[in-house]
Amino acid sequence: MYIVIVDTGCANLTSIKVAINNLGYNATITSESSIILKSNKIFLPGVGTASAVMDLLSKKKIINVIRECKQTILGICLGMQLFCASSEESNGVKTIGIIKTPALRLKVNNLSLPHIGWNQITFQKGHALFKNIPNNSRFYFVHSYMVPINKYTLSTTNYGINFSSIIQKDNFFGVQFHPEKSGNIGSQLLKNFLEI
């Protein structure tokens, strides 16, 4: 299996690569469209701002490569938010647009932002991504923006409000949390994704 991690210039690229290696797979970090197109599985990580990552993807001319890919792709944290039509960040940023829902700033009343730490995900029905993962398992989150609950939501999490913690539309999967920082349960989710 040929696995690619899209080089979004963010800090968690190596930790994702190590997590994949620990499952017995090799992954290539790249922003070359020809290499991305040859892959079987794609990871789209993101840490930082939507505008910075979209600028980088635009400069590398890989926005349409991602938008039109037929391979199974997993957006992680900001990577999931980039699948939305836009982000509220920086007074509005146009993103990749796989789903029409916008990514919104978390409104958490008296809770602190960003949302940092372990929190549970709740899913309503079985899915191959949840194999050997008990409902209400806890994953590690670091974010200030979220994807509202929509028809592509597979699991939800509550931090002041309920939001999508996992989405799927066709071959596009997204997780708001960091599976590579979520211990054994995160490794299981990565394994499940690679086996879909």
From Swiss-Prot:
Residues 2-196 form the Glutamine amidotransferase type-1 domain. It is found in: Cytoplasm. IGPS catalyzes the conversion of PRFAR and glutamine to IGP, AICAR and glutamate. The HisH subunit catalyzes the hydrolysis of glutamine to glutamate and ammonia as part of the synthesis of IGP and AICAR. The resulting ammonia molecule is channeled to the active site of HisF. GO terms for biological process: L-histidine biosynthetic process. GO terms for molecular function: glutaminase activity; imidazoleglycerol-phosphate synthase activity; lyase activity. Heterodimer of HisH and HisF. InterPro entries: Class_I_gatase-like, GATASE, Imidazole-glycPsynth_HisH. NCBIfam families: IMP_synth_hisH (TIGR01855). This is Imidazole glycerol phosphate synthase subunit HisH. Keywords: Amino-acid biosynthesis, Cytoplasm, Glutamine amidotransferase, Histidine biosynthesis, Hydrolase, Lyase. The active site is at C77 (nucleophile), H178, E180. Its EC number is 4.3.2.10, 3.5.1.2. Pathway: Amino-acid biosynthesis; L-histidine biosynthesis; L-histidine from 5-phospho-alpha-D-ribose 1-diphosphate: step 5/9. It catalyses: 5-[(5-phospho-1-deoxy-D-ribulos-1-ylimino)methylamino]-1-(5-phospho-beta-D-ribosyl)imidazole-4-carboxamide + L-glutamine = D-erythro-1-(imidazol-4-yl)glycerol 3-phosphate + 5-amino-1-(5-phospho-beta-D-ribosyl)imidazole-4-carboxamide + L-glutamate + H(+); L-glutamine + H2O = L-glutamate + NH4(+). One of its GO terms (cellular component) is cytoplasm. The keyword Hydrolase applies. Its main location: cytoplasm.
